[in-house]
């Protein structure tokens, strides 16, 4: 699909309107993509996340929801934080929760008047979601969104060739 791109790159260096952070529910940073985005964006991201925790999400951001902050010192304008499902504990709701991450991130980007967004492979790291299945959920979700908003340019950004190849193979099957 013309609006969907796959690439191997550093997501913190993306020159897009919004970068999606595969966050943990605390919104306070962590490992993997979450830690990299917090480090690259600097104190502004953490400061806004702390405000969100005290105002809107005292118990943390729920799985599948999305919320935006500044991107701080990164090239992007916004970071959209979303919490993916932990595969071992999401039971029969894994696909729905992961799809919600993508759909709600895209809705948030659209509300912010963004026309470009970069996603990591949400939940495929420490959260253990099988990459091939996650790729199919991601692709179906963004494809569905593009049926209502053709103006969005969507990037899937991977830190490894292995992840890139798995996602590329998975979406060929759809």
Show which residues each predicted segment covers.
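Macrodomain-like recognition of ADP-ribose-binding/processing modules
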Residues: 1-174
